[in-house]
Amino acid sequence: MRLLVSCVDSGSIKEVLCNIGTDTSVQSALQPFHVAPHLAEGLKAYVDRMWVISEDEAILARNSGVVELVKISKHLKENEALQVDPKGESKNEKSLSDDLPKFDISEFEITSSVSDLFDDAKLESLSSKSVKRTKLVDGFVTLCPIKKDSSNNTFVAATKSGLLHIIKKGEDKKLIKLASLGLKAPVEFLQLYDLEDTDTDKYIFAYGGEENLIKLVEIDSSFQSLKQIWEAKNVKNDRLDMRVPVWPMALRFLEPSPGKTEKGKLNYQFAAITRWSHLTKYSTQHGRKPFAQIDLLPNREPLSQMEVFDAKGENVVSSLGNFQSETFNELNVITTDYKKNVFKFDGNGRMLGKVGRDDITGSSTYIHVHDGKYLLQGGLDRYVRIFDIKTNKMLVKVYVGSRINFIVMLDDVEIEMPLSPSAKAAKGKQKRKVTELEEDADELWNKLEGKVAASKASKKSKI
């Protein structure tokens, strides 16, 4: 497996190469083959978001307000020319290469960047109104391609201050800022819609945040203007007739509602997680209020993230994380609180379990379902973990020495382990045994076929 991990403390991305079964917290367990930092720029410039464009290119967004285009090149890891075995005899290069696993490692080079993408002044006036105890600081909430396109040349970079930047990778491999548009701040998330081939002249996305109701926005292909096409309404007051606070934290679209639809009304469906531990379900055909609001946790513990998954381990999400289904009945969500819990719920709010409940010791700052099979998790305890989405079994645990902000799995290919001399001898012996059995079987069949042919010939001669 090959991972890229955003490390907050050093501002670097670390490349991690490991196999299933790796656990750095157990000395006798399998250890990672390679862990190396790249592009370190310090605590004030850690990587907020990453998007892998291709095998040899990625785009990074740092919390210093910079978006960078990065070239990735791979080369075979060089083994040391000489080692000494326990008996004191030196090993030559050939025997050493036979004893060590072979794999490629990556080198990263920044080829282009755009800067000054933040507006902290816009958040200063909102800090006094926020229930957060810390000052609001700008950061990236989204970095992704604006449409399903194999070329992936145009990207959306959205910030907490409500700035929406359109950035293009030119033919000369340089980043160009095409436009910057404004949204209502503060913004906790911005989610693009990618579940159907919409009109190429417009793109749809949803956003929201603290006291910022969910809004659907349409942007034209020229990227010069945007138009709000729908806004949610708050639910009715609670049983004490108190206003319910608004704070959507994350959102995922579903496919359009099937069957009969009312003309003149938008047809979008989506589910959202709120800060106050609600799962809300919306259909624009139904109205502006959620048609269902489910309490996930009894004491309204704050929740922060949202991923959707299939209980059978199948890939049910689009490239941007939206749920490829028309019905909420099949919806399953993973979310995290600010303690140490990673929860799994079905679409009706029934808890399906906790992931890593006996192992995770700090708040999870990042979760992601990869390819429907793996849950990537990292947080304050400085461990990268990979879980099996069906069984919740921990497959990988690697210490990276820093708080974790983002994880990308580049591939899940296992690195082939070289065999020891005794294992090689046993494997060769087994192979020879199989070959001998196959030869004996062939010889036996040949004898039987010869006898059958001779029997037929004798019968013909008698006739």
Curated annotation (Swiss-Prot):
Listed GO CC annotations: nucleolus; nucleus; preribosome, large subunit precursor
Q: What is its main location?
A: nucleus
Q: Which UniProt keywords apply?
A: Nucleus, Ribosome biogenesis, rRNA processing
BP GO annotations = ribosomal large subunit biogenesis; rRNA processing
**Other noteworthy facts:** Present with 2740 molecules/cell in log phase SD medium.
The free-text function statement in the UniProt record for this protein reads: Involved in the biogenesis of the 60S ribosomal subunit.
Cite the record's note on assembly.
Component of the pre-66S ribosomal particle. Interacts with NOP7, RRP1 and RRP5.
Identification of the protein by name: Ribosome biogenesis protein NSA1
Q: Which organism encodes this protein? A: Saccharomyces cerevisiae (strain ATCC 204508 / S288c) (Baker's yeast)
